[in-house]
């Protein structure tokens, strides 16, 4: 076996022994804001809305990089505000997301949501 094959075999064995290697490797190059965004989205998915909102806002305050990351943070903040009946804050977060990326659209199942769907649609002009 060539040295490259041995190296590939060793690398596969080493990585199979630690499932979180990929996450650990990526987190080495992530900013604080990106890590807070990821944890904030997971907290949202777990129903921890107050904690999620703190993390999402913290990610933005930390200078979150990347258009898609900033839009994602604003979108989840909007969801949290809408579900807690804070419609003006919800609208403001959707507005901020659209300022970051005017092409921002919700997924089909998100835009049809009975609480935040109408708020989002009130800000997003319809295509003719």
Regions found by a protein language model. Give the residues of each.
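Bacterial Sec signal peptide processing site at the extreme N-terminus
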Residues: 14-35, 39
């Amino acid at each position: 076996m060539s040295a490259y094959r041995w190296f590939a075999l060793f690398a596969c064995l080493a990585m199979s022994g630690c499932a979180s290697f990929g996450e650990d490797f990526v987190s080495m190059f992530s900013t604080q804001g990106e890590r807070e965004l990821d944890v904030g989205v997971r907290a949202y998915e777990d129903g921890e809305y107050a904690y999620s909102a703190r993390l999402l806002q913290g990610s933005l305050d930390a200078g979150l990089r990347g258009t898609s990351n900033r839009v994602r943070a604003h979108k989840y903040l909007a969801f949290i505000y809408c579900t807690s009946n804070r419609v003006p804050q919800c609208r403001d977060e959707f507005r901020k997301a659209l300022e970051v990326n005017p092409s921002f659209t919700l997924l089909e199942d998100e835009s049809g949501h009975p609480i935040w769907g109408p708020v989002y649609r009130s800000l997003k002009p319809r295509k003719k």
